[in-house]
A protein has these predicted regions:
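Noncatalytic, basic helical substrate-engagement surface that gates or grips nucleic-acid strands
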Residues: 1-132, 136-163, 236-239, 245-253, ...
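Conserved RNase H-like, two-metal-ion catalytic cores of nucleic-acid enzymes
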Residues: 4-5, 15-54, 72-73, 77-84, ...
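Active-site palm subdomain of RNA-directed nucleic acid polymerases
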Residues: 509-521, 525, 848-873, 877
């Protein structure tokens, strides 16, 4: 039976684009392909599952339509089309052309009207017709053979026939969808509707009167406020009905021969998808056969190959899963077979492995099982007993495998597995390949979990952990609660899919020039971070108690002062109440900024700008700062001490920041305040191991030194080589003074300029930061570039290269992809341009300290140092040091930090010793 599908292009493109908004699909050229990928997925799913005989895709035309001409505000509220969508549309049209699918577009009419006209004609011919769109206004067209095919939230589609539309919207006829939208309006299209009438009221009115026409004739039957609303907005309601009505008389013919589904232009499809880097789409759209995907019994011989039954099937979208994939996953639970498995695995050059445990916290996690894979679609799972002695016996069987330095270890988030195995006396050694970190280097600003990567690279839907242990919450089980027979396929799949991902990601790393960075920095850093996390850091809880008491008393004093200044008591923690006190009662400014909901804006930025208006503002800011310190650090840190180890174990993250810097979490120790007496009190609470001293080493002005090297500016290089105070030297150049004559104020301004200008700060931004006039800020920036001309050249060149390549790159070839670098939107483009300047500097500095950490770790091991590296905070390394190793540790750390990279200027690290972090730094 013939079946016609009509697709609303822009509705689907927008939906696809925003579905990926938090995890955009960026290819190696820096192009955002989210809209194209989502649209192609929808198109392919429709073609393969619904099997239409006829297909057309309708687009809105360039320029205004009859609705715009009738109502200037029509769709005016809709934000400007994102540039990535504008760039995607011609490519989508190219794909449709290569598929021989007609693009339906009529000047002056929207896609709705084109589809409405064609659907009506097709329905009258008796052709089953489906309108694919998420937009509810299409409901008015449904009837007879014409149906809506609507994407559901969360996946899948719903088909709405006449009864379905009536039931969904609570109306008596699909045509009443027009009345529904005419009354309730449509914010997306800026159809005004009747003010104060929502969907429920609109449905009630339609059921009472039958539609807008009768309603407006019988308004005397209405009462109260509703009557007033309707009568005062009669013209607007009628006009809204006009705007909501889809035309069915557009000048376009229904050409079934043209709409008939045809064979695609294979060569063109391959060319387009290769250019987009949609490798799996080539297979999917061209219907290339693949081997039948079939499960293999886990009773096969332990190391037998997967049998080939000669059958073929076609992979469909992301529907590939364990149920449809040929695989051989083995549950290995007998000691004799476990030993055989280890003997077999150890003969391979590589092994993909994973651990199943009782906790996501590696420090406390107990092993539940081990999984391994050395061949795609084959994997093995070994359950581990809850009895510690029995567990160690199983783990020790695999110890020679894990500790074999000749075997490449492959994993996903391997740092976790390294720490778990270390708790059982096993050290994972040799070269490593972590798929999470590999993907981070390829697409740093997206998510790197295995489930997402499997769908993106393998077109495969993994078993979700929630399917085994249930959703997060009190009722969630532990892996220990399940039988090995319930776990083994999930666990084996992890090892197998990780191996498959490695085979996809490795060539991609090489293609993008990131393989050396991956092998020589990110992978060697992983065991360093694992050891630091296991080391943990001790906290002086008594010191924090005293700090808490002092800060709480001070906060209460400030609170009383704020209430006195305000002349009333109010909740200082409530932004709403703060706004009302400052701007209504005290009227500290004539016109205060408000949110869309009418609430006063009282964030830090606003309050900082108002500090000079009244002393209460500074007190409110101080009160907020103290409250945050207490809640985030002073009172929170003692609760995070692990009861078993007596230490805090933060997590150091390699895959979070786009620049390459490490971050830390649970707790975030990177954000502990550096300035101010209160921040110092927190640092005082970080102490070394008993009997040890705290040692801290910090790079001096590393980002400015990197800038000097990258720009090659002779004046900046000279200042660093001669060991001058760079900020005083900068001030001397700008203000044309002798370096000895530079004032404290001049040095401060030069320091702010140094760190601001190299990151593209504007005249306005510098004026705000230094609290000086824009003229003075302008002169300061001009003076800076006059004295450091190659810095300006470097900044301009960085932007040009980013525009040409779509990314910025560090000295170690770490890339930051900048999708908006060529945007027509000046604000968006400006942000990307600042990142083009910033990324190579900040990223290179981040890579330098990573190299230093790796080399310090190796020297400690080689020279038998027992002292521990415990913290990394931006450009600073911290250690707990045995007294007898003080001289040795200081020598190693400073040597490795200062020789991590040879540049045109020296790398300098300052260091200090103390009883705690504060004293040492």
């Amino acid at each position: 039976m013939d079946k016609l599908f009509l697709l609303d292009a822009y509705a689907l493109i927008y939906r696809s684009y925003y579905a990926f908004i938090k995890n955009p699909r960026i290819n190696s050229k820096g192009m955002n392909t989210s809209a194209i990928m989502g649209f192609c997925n929808t198109l392919h799913e429709v073609m393969t599952k619904e099997k239409p005989t006829h297909l057309g895709v309708a687009f809105d035309p360039h320029g205004p339509t009859f609705r715009n001409e009738a109502y200037e505000q029509y769709k005016a509220q809709r934000e400007e089309t994102p540039e990535d969508i504008r760039a995607a549309v011609p490519i989508i049209k190219d794909i449709l052309g290569a598929m021989h699918i007609p693009v339906l577009e009529v000047a002056g009419y929207e896609a709705d009207d084109v589809i409405g006209t064609l659907a009506k004609k097709a329905g009258e011919m008796g052709l089953d017709t489906y309108m694919l769109t998420p937009d509810k206004d299409y409901g008015q067209l449904v009837g007879g053979n014409v149906k809506m095919f609507r994407p559901r939230h969360g996946g899948g589609y719903e088909t709405l026939d006449e009864e379905g539309v009536k039931e969904k919207y609570g109306i008596d006829s699909p045509l009443q969808v027009i009345d529904l939208l005419g009354l309730m309006g449509d914010s997306a299209d800026n159809i005004p509707g009747c003010p104060g009438v929502g969907e429920k009221t609109a449905v009630k009115l339609i059921n009472q009167f039958g539609g807008i026409t009768a309603l407006l004739q019988r308004t005397d039957e209405l009462k109260g406020a509703l009557k007033k609303k309707v009568e005062e907005n009669k013209e607007q309601i009628e006009f809204s009905k006009f705007l909501a009505t889809i035309k069915t008389d557009v000048p376009i013919e229904l050409n079934l021969d043209e709409l008939k589904v045809k064979e695609p232009d294979e060569e063109r499809i391959i060319e387009i998808f290769n250019d987009l880097e949609f490798k799996t789409f080539i297979q999917r759209f061209l219907n290339k056969p693949k081997p039948q995907q079939k499960s293999v019994s886990n009773q096969l011989d332990l190391f037998a190959d997967i049998p080939d039954d000669g059958k073929e099937t076609i992979k469909n979208g992301a529907s590939q899963s364990l149920k449809t994939m040929v695989h051989k996953y083995e549950l290995v639970d007998k000691e004799e077979d476990i030993k055989k498995l280890c003997d077999f695995l150890i003969t391979n050059d590589f092994v993909s492995f994973d651990t199943e445990t009782t906790s996501t916290n590696a420090i406390d996690a107990e092993l539940v099982g081990l999984s391994f894979s050395v061949k795609e679609k084959e994997a093995y799972y070994v359950p581990v007993s809850s009895n510690r002695e029995e567990a160690e016996k199983i783990v020790n069987i695999f110890k020679p495998l894990y500790e074999n330095e000749e075997i490449l270890k492959i994993g996903q988030n391997m740092k976790y597995d390294i720490e778990v195995l270390a708790n059982y006396g096993v050290e994972v050694r040799g070269k490593m390949f972590d798929t999470m970190i590999a993907h981070y280097l390829i697409q740093p600003e997206t998510r790197h979990n295995m489930d997402d990567m499997a769908e993106s690279y393998l077109d495969y839907k993994t078993i979700r952990i929630e399917e085994l242990i249930g959703p997060k919450g009190k009722g969630q089980k532990s892996m220990r609660d399940l039988q090995p027979s319930e776990v083994y396929e999930y666990a084996a799949e992890d090892a197998d899919i990780t191996l498959q991902l490695k085979n996809k990601l490795e060539p991609e790393l090489k293609k993008r020039g990131a393989y050396d960075l991956f092998c020589n920095i990110e992978m060697p850093l992983m065991p360093v971070l694992a050891e630091m996390e296991m080391n943990g850091v001790r906290i002086d809880t008594q010191s924090l108690k005293e700090t808490s008491r002092t800060l709480t008393e001070r906060m209460h004093e400030i609170e009383q002062r704020i209430h006195e200044l305000a002349g009333m008591e109010f909740n200082i923690a409530s932004p709403k109440q703060v706004g009302e006190v400052l701007f209504e009662k005290m009227k500290i400014v004539e016109k205060a900024k408000k949110t869309k909901t009418g609430q006063y804006v009282t964030n830090e930025e606003v309050l900082q700008s108002l500090k000079g208006k009244h002393e209460i503002v500074a007190d409110i800011l101080e009160h907020r700062g103290l409250k945050k310190l207490l809640g985030t650090y002073v009172d929170a840190l003692p609760k995070l001490i692990n009861p078993r180890t007596g230490r805090i174990h933060t997590s150091f993250n390699q895959t979070v920041t786009a620049t390459g810097r490490l971050s830390s979490s649970d707790p975030n120790l990177q954000n502990i305040p550096v300035r101010g007496e209160d921040g110092k009190e927190i640092r005082k609470a970080f102490v070394p191991e008993p009997g040890c001293e705290f040692f801290s080493a910090d790079y001096s002005q590393i980002e400015l030194r990197v800038m000097a090297h990258l720009s090659g500016d002779e004046n900046m290089i000279e200042a660093f080589r001669e060991g001058h105070d760079i900020h005083a030297a900068t001030a001397a150049k700008i203000y044309k003074e002798s370096i000895d004559e530079v004032s404290r104020d001049q040095r401060t301004k030069a320091k702010r300029a140094n760190f601001g200008i190299i990151y593209g700060i504007t005249v306005f931004g510098l004026a705000e930061r230094l609290e000086i006039s824009r003229d003075e800020a302008k002169q300061l920036i001009e003076g800076y570039f006059e004295n450091f001309p190659k810095v300006k050249e470097y900044m301009d060149k960085s932007i040009q290269m980013a525009r040409a390549n779509g990314y910025a790159e560090t000295l170690f070839h770490r890339r930051r992809y900048l999708a908006d670098i060529n945007s027509h939107n000046a604000t968006v483009r400006g942000f990307a341009e600042r990142n083009a300047i910033n990324a190579p500097i900040q990223g290179t500095a981040a890579d330098i300290i990573k190299v230093a950490m790796i080399n310090v770790y190796r020297r400690f091991r080689k020279e038998g140092v027992k002292s521990k590296m415990i913290l990394q905070v931006h450009d600073e390394l911290n250690f707990s040091v045995l007294p007898e190793e003080k001289e040795k540790v200081e020598k190693i750390v400073l040597e490795e930090m200062q020789n991590a990279l040879k540049m045109q200027v020296p790398l300098v690290a300052d260091s200090g010793w103390g009883k705690n972090w504060l004293e040492a730094h």
